[in-house]
Each structure stands twice: as C-alpha cells, then as structure tokens.
A protein has these predicted regions:
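Conserved N-terminal/central alpha/beta ligand/cofactor-binding core
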Residues: 8-13, 18, 36, 42-43, ...
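Beta1/beta-strand and adjacent pyrophosphate-binding region of the FAD-binding site
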Residues: 15-27
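Beta-sandwich interaction modules
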Residues: 534-551, 561-564, 732-757, 761-766
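Bacterial carbohydrate/catabolite-sensing allosteric modules
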Residues: 495
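Aromatic, loop-rich ligand-recognition surfaces of beta-strand-rich domains
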Residues: 484, 498-499, 504-519, 641-728, ...
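Flavin (FAD/FMN)-binding glycine-rich loop and adjacent Rossmann-like elements that form
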Residues: 11, 15, 56, 132, ...
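PGST-rich, cysteine-poor low-complexity/disordered linker and tail segments that act as flexible spacers
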Residues: 576-653, 659-660
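N-terminal Rossmann-fold NAD(P) dinucleotide-binding loop
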Residues: 30
Length: 781
C-alpha cells in the first residue's frame, strides 16, 4: 500500500535519456530515418506522439503509401523508392496483399523494435526544448500520457519528422506557411500574389456488408444537407478509405492550431456522406452495409515548411535540375488541392506530372539557422508548389533515409549537417545511401570496399534477347501500344510483330525515344511508317529502322491504334523490358495527354503506361540482332534498378539453374555478401485498401546457394578448419530460400578466405529467367 500526504505540488517522474540522434515523429519519414541511423551504428531515440507508427499510413488514418510510381499512372518507370521504405512495401506485399492497415502497423512496428539501437517512445509528445546556444539544440522534453512520465532527451543531433515541425518551431528555425507568389522563385504555376491558403486535412471511413439489413441513425452533428458538398453527385457506394481523399477541409484555417475544429467538421462530413449513402434512397445496395471504421484523427497534408540552405521549387521538378548534393528523388505530380476542400466547386485536385523523376538536394533537409537540426517528411525546404510533389509519403520516407544516414555520419564524426556539403563528406553520404538500397538518379555506387569489383565475373549464360515467343493470346489495338526495348549506341535493331488482321487496313508504326536518356516519356519520334495490311491471321510485321541510336536508352517501338488489328502476346517476361499503352490512369491524370494551362511552366506530353498484372503482358516479337544488354558486367556497374538500361544480369530462358562465378587473382577474405534482386520497381505496391494478386514479384529470384567451387583452396577459418586445405567437392556456405525482398545481406558466421565463389540461382518461373542487379562482397560483417 502507498499513501501520500497532502503537498503544495508534485513533479512528474522524469526519465533522462542520452543518445546519438533524437528523431521526433514516427511517421514513415521518422521511422526510416531512425532505422537507417540505427543500422549505421547510432543510438537513436524515436519519439512518437501516437500509439502506432506510420503516420498517415497507419491504421489511424489509412492512406496508402505512394511516391514516384504514382499508381503506375505516369511515365516514371521503375521508380519505386528504395532502401527501408522498399523493405516495408515489399514485406507488406508478401504478408498483406489484401491491404489490411492493421497488418501494416505490425510490419512497421516490428522493423523498429527489431533494431536494438532504437529506443521507441510511443504516445509521447515533445512540448519543450533546451538550447546550448542560440542556434544549437541541447535537449527536448516530451510527455507520455500513458505512463505519466516526462522524458528529457539529450543528443548532439536532432531530426524533426513531426509533420508540423514542433522541434523546429520551438527552436526558432525559419519556416513559412502558405503559398509563395510567382515572383519569389520564378515559378510560373504559382499565383501572382502570396496567400495563406493550404491543403486541408482528411478523414476516411470504411464500410462492410453484413449480409442483412442495417439501419443507420446519424449523429446530430452529421451534415444533413448533402448538397452543401458541390460534388455530392460524385459520391459512390463503393468508395471507402483513402478513395475518399477528396473529403478534405481546413485549408483556409490554421492547420496546426485549428486541427480539432477541422476534425469536427470532417466528422460532420464523413457521417453526412454515410447518411446520404444509407438513407437518401439513391443507393439501394447499401441496405446491408454498415460503417466498420471512421478515422478519429485527421490525416494532415500541409502546415509549416522549414527553410534550408536551398528551397526546392517548381523548376527543379519540371526541368529535372541536377544537384551535386542529391541524396534522394521524387516523382509524384505537383498535386495541389483547393483550400476549401470538399466545399469547393473546383475539382478536388489538379495534378501535373514531370517527364521523369527529379533529384532532391541534401541542402533542403536541414535548417538554415539551427545548426544541429535535420528536417524530414513534409516539412523539408520546398516552395508550396514543389511541396505539392515532395509531400507524399514514399518520397518523405526516402528523404528520411537520407537524413538518417547523414545524421549518423554527423553523430559519429562530431559534425553538423552543413559540414557534409564538402565533397569528400557528400561522396561518403551518397555512397553509404547507395549501399543500403537508396536510389539517387544519375549517381552510381563506386565502392572501394566491394571485393566483387576486382573479381572476374562470369555466368553459365547471359540472355541475348531475340524474341518474346507468342502464347497464342491476342489483344486488339484499341489503343496505341509500344514495346520498351533497351538499346545501345549504333544501328537500331529491326523487330517483327505477329498480327491478326480482320479487314484490309493501314497500320501506323513509330519509333520513339525520350529527349533525356534516363526518362521514359517517348516524345521524340524518329521514324514513322504507314504499312498496308491484308486480312489474315498470323501475319508477320517486319519493321526496319534506318536510324542510329546516339546513347544507351529505351526505344519505344509503337503500334498505333487500329481496330482492325490484333497483336499477339507473349507469356514471357524479362527484367527491364515492358509493354506500355498510350492511356491514362484516372487516379492521377485527366486524359492520355497532359495539357496544362498555357504559360504555367509545365510540359505537355503523352502518358505511356503499363498494365498491372495479371495483365500487362509483353507483345510477341522478334529482335534482330538480339539485345545483348544483360551481361554480368551489370552486376558491378553501380545501379540496382533499370534506368536507361536494365542494369541487370539475366540468364537465358533455357537455364533454369544458372550459375554466377566470381574469381580473384589471389584469395580474399569474405565475411559479407550483398545481393540485389528484381522486386519490380515499377510496381507501386499500394500499402492499404488496394488488394494485389501477388505476394512475390514474378521477376524475383527466390532461391540462391552461395558456394565455394570444387578444387579451390580454402584457407584457415572455414568450417573451423586449421591451416590450409583443398576442397574436392563444392562447399555450400549459405543458402537463401523463399526470398521475396529486393536485397539480401548474407553475414557469414565464419568468414571464408577463397579465390572463387559461385552463386547458384533458380529461375523464378519457366517464362521468367533468373536476374540479379548486384553482387557485392566485403571483408567485414
């Protein structure tokens, strides 16, 4: 028993924590920053003011995670973000293809608690801080409502990933709220005058079918007059969860201090919409539906944006400007919403895409006036226009990974964020990011510690792509289609399609390229041919192109719309080769061709996008000469996804169990092997609501054996042996079974010293040859 006598006052219990890095905010940006920093060796305290991690992606809000892939609705091919956010998305696809947000919660929590270097504080809100001088944070104070404990967290480096920027605000970091005038940054899409208008908050709901009639009596605060929503006719019975993104409000208010007011208005709207669905009589199929869940906190879009040493602007996105300090990338559209949200008569959003992904500079990821403060998430240094793209969660997470590694370097070397701009430090940061799977457009990994770079690498086969064999299935040319073929400088190969023609007709074909080799927007037409076709089945269509390709790139061999023609398809798939259709995805575009308002500084171009599986098959064709772009040299070229080329070694279709061999001039001690697989970076892997037909991507190699081949000397340390001995039989040193991830790190319990290694892979399927982007070997664990 405990008794306490009366007292004038009491103090809360206080826990004092010291760490290398304090990360405030447990959304995806904070989570990815914390994990990458912890894996880099830093002691991290992760402070989250909610009971779960994930922010807007969590079960509290239930927004799907998206980024540069943009629902596969733009021309950003193979643009899913890499690193930790990729691990999360791929693991969620494997465990949770149905898109249950509760399962996603567990995956994110598991990844954090599995890191021994992270101390996680849930339900803990930062409310105060202490500074050691005017521009340096010493510690933050936070309160946990669940255990009535105050935490004082001291660190040399802080990461503000809190969404509203609580640490930056308390520290006095420069920030802004609202919309800049076009004159400030020369942004043609910005308004003439600055304003306080913002994007608003959103609350979603889920419904389910009970199989029996269910009555709904709305709460007194529900919106009764549905016509107050100008777009009330857009309400659909099947819309649920984040498909209701347009139920948005609050952009004309203070989206920080008025958040509770905004929440109540959004509850009013959400229950009013459901009342309309249930009780208006317009949706008879809703009789057996009931509400399953309504959000209790709003998903926030915009509030403070903090100022770094540079502010990302419209031109950085549209013109794809290059930055020496690039550490991340974006690719979502400039996606802005009317500030009145659901009560606006305007469309719920306007989305304007770039022709490809854009670099994000490191200088936008730290405060310009608080020396030891990193910025992560939607608060990074960007104009309101650029924020329209950089705000989405996968982009925020990818940026957070850059911040996490940078913070770890700073903590280890007693540096401040700005110190990493010096060339050697920036190269180290980029190198460390690329090592962990981060994609930085245009930057290749050059890793002096990688022993594979000095090995002679061979394989039992390399694909020379001469055809996609026809399956017997055909597809009418109800739209224009193209095969994206990776070509090298020199004469363009000829191709031959297989057609069925229902009536005499003339088919238009085109050969197109992108104006930039790393882009996949086919706006440059090199050759146009009008070919007369007779009626018949299995008609061969040979196409020869008298053109020379100047640089390694993807060529689009296009068959334009013709209702009298059907093209034969193939069941074969190959890493880095796709068929694309000239169409649009209504989720992110209004028409097959983007036509922005004149003078707004945004490009016009066509969308050529693939179909999702189980559709999305390649067009059957022959290629002469075969494409020889899948060699083992790709395994050490520094790129771990398709860019302007596939960047993958691919085995021949006939080799079900190909072998990659590494040989050195002298024995090497190997403790760690890293492999990069094809988890289909073109797939957005939407995390919730949208179900997916696959748990493992069809290109992903599931089984790998790592062995020391026979007749190779094996030196001390292998299998606890003493001295040198010779192996007459193959020695299996590691085996991967049922892989589904993009990356696997093999840490050998006992390092081996050898002058040869073999990787034995099993092809994912009869119609998909084995492929690998990277193999790296290291002497350290």
């Amino acid at each position: 028993m405990m008794q306490s006598s009366p007292s004038n006052s009491r103090e809360l219990k206080t826990n004092r924590l010291g760490c290398d890095i304090a990360v405030i905010g447990g959304g995806l940006a904070g989570v990815c920053a914390a994990i990458t920093a912890a894996r880099a060796g830093s002691q991290v305290v992760l402070v989250q003011d909610r009971p779960v991690l994930g922010g807007n992606a969590s079960s509290e809000v239930r927004l799907w995670i998206l980024g540069a892939t943009s629902h596969m609705g733009n021309n950003n091919r193979w643009a899913r973000e890499g690193g930790v956010i990729d691990e999360i998305l791929v693991e969620n696809m494997y465990r949770n293809p149905e898109g249950n947000p509760l399962i996603l919660d567990t995956i994110i929590l598991e990844m954090v608690v599995n890191e021994s270097n992270i101390t996680l504080l849930l339900n803990t809100a930062v409310h105060d801080l202490e500074k050691s001088d005017a521009d340096t944070i010493k510690s933050v104070r936070a309160f946990c409502s669940q255990n009535s404990t105050t935490y004082q967290i001291t660190a040399p480096v802080f990461v503000d990933a809190s969404g509203d920027g609580i640490v930056g605000f308390l520290a006095g970091a420069a920030f802004r709220i609202g919309t800049e005038a076009s004159s400030e940054f020369g942004e043609k899409f910005a308004p003439e005058k600055a304003s306080s208008e913002l994007l608003g908050h959103t609350i979603y709901f889920y419904s389910k079918d009970t199989g029996r009639p269910v009555k709904f009596i709305p709460p007194s605060f529900a919106l009764r007059d549905i016509t107050k929503i100008p777009r009330w006719r857009d309400i659909k019975i099947n819309d649920t969860g984040c498909r209701l993104w347009w139920l948005e409000w609050g952009g004309t208010l203070d989206t920080i201090h008025d958040s509770e007011k905004i929440k109540w208005e959004l509850w009013k709207v959400a229950y009013g919409v459901w009342n309309h669905i249930k009780n208006s009589g317009q949706f008879p199929d809703a009789a057996t539906l009931t509400l399953e869940w309504v959000g209790t906190i709003p998903g926030k879009r915009e509030s403070r944006r903090f100022e770094g040493d540079v502010m990302i602007k419209q031109q950085d996105l549209v013109e794809q400007r290059q930055h020496a300090d690039t550490v991340s990338f974006g690719g979502w559209a400039i996606d802005l919403h009317p500030s009145d949200g659901v009560f606006s008569a305007q469309p719920g959003c306007q989305q304007w895409h770039s022709k490809g992904v854009f670099q994000i500079p490191y200088r936008a990821m730290y405060s310009r006036n608080i020396k030891n403060l990193f910025l992560a998430g939607r608060i990074i240094s960007a104009s309101h226009i650029a924020f329209g793209s950089t705000r989405v969660m996968a982009t925020c997470a990818h940026n957070g990974q850059a911040v996490g590694v940078a913070a770890a370097i700073c903590a280890k070397n007693e540096l401040q964020p700005r110190d990493l701009l010096a060339a050697p430090s920036m190269q180290e940061l980029q190198r460390e990011l690329l090592r962990i799977g981060q994609y930085i457009p245009g930057v290749a990994l050059v890793d002096e510690k990688d022993l594979a770079r000095t090995a002679e690498i061979t394989a039992t086969s390399e694909l020379k792509l001469s055809q996609f064999a026809p399956s017997g299935e055909t597809m009418p040319l109800d739209a224009s289609w193209a095969m994206m073929l990776p070509v090298q400088p020199g004469a363009m190969p000829s191709v031959e399609f297989l057609l069925d023609v229902s009536a005499p007709t003339t088919l238009r074909t085109e050969l197109r390229l992108s104006s930039k080799p790393d882009n996949h927007t086919p706006e440059v037409t090199l050759v146009t041919q009008e070919i007369k076709l007779r009626t018949g089945a299995l008609i061969k269509l040979p196409l020869k192109f008298d053109v020379v390709i100047d640089a390694s790139c993807y060529a689009f061999v296009c068959l334009m719309t013709n209702p009298d023609v059907a093209v034969h398809l193939s069941d074969q798939r190959v890493t880095g080769v796709l068929a694309v259709k000239q169409k649009f995805n209504r989720a992110v575009a209004k028409s097959p061709r983007q036509e922005p308002p004149a003078g707004c500084g945004i490009d016009s171009f066509e969308f050529w996008i693939p179909q999702r599986r189980p559709a999305g098959k390649n067009l059957a064709l022959k290629i002469d000469p075969p494409l020889a772009v899948f060699s083992v040299q790709n395994l050490t070229n520094g790129f771990a996804r398709p860019t302007n080329q596939p960047n993958a070694w691919v085995a021949d279709f006939s080799h079900e169990q190909p072998v990659i061999s590494l040989a050195w001039d002298k024995p090497q001690t190997i403790a760690r092997i890293e492999l990069s697989f094809d988890s289909d970076f073109d797939h957005p892997m939407e995390s919730v609501l949208m179900g997916h037909p696959e748990r493992v991507m069809p290109f992903c190699v599931r089984e790998v054996m790592v062995a020391i081949p026979a007749k190779i000397p094996v030196l001390a340390g292998y299998h606890n042996g003493n001295g040198s001995k010779s192996s007459d039989t193959e020695r299996l040193i590691f085996q991967i079974a049922e892989n589904h991830q993009s990356r696997q790190i093999i840490r050998l319990a006992t390092p081996v010293t050898t002058d040869a290694l073999e990787l034995r892979l099993v092809a994912p399927g009869a119609n998909v040859p084995a492929a690998l982007f990277e193999v790296r070997c290291y002497s350290d664990i």
